[in-house]
């Protein structure tokens, strides 16, 4: 068997090696971040991200659909995450006032306090696990590589066709 062609359907040995490292990081990093946040703040990483996104939004509020898009979770998964945060008093839900059709998730003062308390430990863990040991040049390269990947993924996602409410198809934007 000959070596895979860079333009052929199979990954080259180098691509396969990089892909496996990427998969390992993609698997190990969320587990490590979840463990740190759970241990120190009683939060999952996805809950932390929801709180952080709400803290950065105008009026600390986002429509549930916007929140789902921002965290790249399914609407039902976001709804469950928000329900758990709501039970703890960290978030509340209200009917969207602009059209009354959807719900908004709103970060409470208690939620903001818990986010602020959790942030230093989370930031330290991210600095250690993601950026620790990288030179300034490697950090720049990592940012460049991830930006290219994100752009390609977002373009692909935006170009997918989703079923429309009327039974036809529409472009997802």
Q: Whereabouts are the PLM-identified features?
A:
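Charged, amphipathic alpha-helical coiled-coil/dimerization segments
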Residues: 4, 83-144
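N-terminal positioning helix adjacent to the helix-turn-helix/winged-helix DNA-binding module
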Residues: 14, 46-48, 110, 138
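N-terminal helix-turn-helix DNA-binding core of bacterial DNA-binding proteins
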Residues: 31-74
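C-terminal regulatory/oligomerization modules of transcriptional regulators
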Residues: 1-13, 136-173
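N-terminal leader segment of winged-helix/HTH proteins
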Residues: 1-41, 172-173
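Short, locally clustered residues in the helix-turn-helix/winged-helix DNA-binding domain
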Residues: 23, 52-56, 119
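Short, hydrophobic-biased segments on the C-terminal half of alpha helices
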Residues: 64, 82-83
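Residues in the helix-turn-helix
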Residues: 77
């Amino acid at each position: 068997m000959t070596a895979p062609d860079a333009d052929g359907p199979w990954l080259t040995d180098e691509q396969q090696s990089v892909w496996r490292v990427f998969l390992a990081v993609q698997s190990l990093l969320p587990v490590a971040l979840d463990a740190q946040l759970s241990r120190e703040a009683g939060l999952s990483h996805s809950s932390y991200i929801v709180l952080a996104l709400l803290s950065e939004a105008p009026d600390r509020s986002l429509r549930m659909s916007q929140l789902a898009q921002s965290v790249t979770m399914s609407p039902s998964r976001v709804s469950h995450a928000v329900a758990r945060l709501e039970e703890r008093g960290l978030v509340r839900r209200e009917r969207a006032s602009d059209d009354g059709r959807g719900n908004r998730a709103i970060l409470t003062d208690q939620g903001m306090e818990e986010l602020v308390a959790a942030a230093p430990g989370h930031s330290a863990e991210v600095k250690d696990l993601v950026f620790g040991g990288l030179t300034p040049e490697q950090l720049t390269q990592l940012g460049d590589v991830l930006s290219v990947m994100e752009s390609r993924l977002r373009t692909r996602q935006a170009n997918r066709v989703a079923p429309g409410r009327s039974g036809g198809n529409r472009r997802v934007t």
